[in-house]
Amino acid sequence: RKADGQDAAGDAFAWRVLKRMIFLGVFILCQVVPMYAIYTFGPEIMTAFGLGEGHEAILGESAVSLFFLVGSIPAMFWLNSMGRRKLLLISLVFMGAGLTILGMWPMAPIFVVILAFGMYAFFSGGPGILQWLYPNELFPTEVRASAVGIAIGFSRIGTIVSTYGTPLFLAAFGVGPTMLVAAVLVGICLIMSWFIAPETKGKSLAETSALEESIPFTRRV
């Protein structure tokens, strides 16, 4: 009976670790693919939105890159004042809204395109930080290194998908559908985060990495 109890406890531990691993992997993949697509193919995407060729497209992409940088600064403070979960959900809503505008209105005026890209880039700061913070907070010591490794692995997968998939999809379907696919990925991340993303604000590392069901996965915003 003792052995059976130990086996059951081991199975429960493995399932809770797996559940967090799935959350981490999907979260990182859905966050990284659109971001790296915009990072890597910014000038081409800007040209497709009518920002012109060469220097004009590069200037537009540089403005978006500035939003990426600026957005990460307040996010570092909001992580503790607002909380991880709330910051993640709010950020994903605005990121998805920006991409949806771009996807539904590919012929929008230039200022709308820049503002929509800026909205996405600015609010990506929070998820970008959580991409590396969550693996260290959500897993006990014995599996934490593996969790960080998995996070890095999914990040690399997202980079590969963006690098090889974005130009092919742009050429085949155009910039509007490409942005809508990116918005769908952000939407998937939002839905999953609503049901699964934990709040670790104000908790010690021992508390956040504990695998009891009562601690990590709350649906309260």
List PLM regions with ranges.
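Extracytoplasmic gate region of multi-pass secondary transporters
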Residues: A12-I73
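Helix-to-loop junctions at the C-terminal end of transmembrane segments
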Residues: S72-R84, L170
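A membrane-interface helix-boundary motif in multi-pass transporters
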Residues: L170-V184
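Intracellular juxtamembrane helix-capping segments at the cytosolic ends
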Residues: G125-F139
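Loop-to-transmembrane helix entry/capping segments in MFS-fold secondary transporters
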Residues: G54, T141-A151
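Hydrophobic core of transmembrane alpha-helices in multi-pass small-molecule transporters
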Residues: F111-G126
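C-terminal ends and interior cores of transmembrane alpha-helices
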Residues: F94-M107
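Intracellular cytosolic loops and amphipathic helices of Major Facilitator Superfamily
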Residues: R1-R20, I45-F49, K203-V221
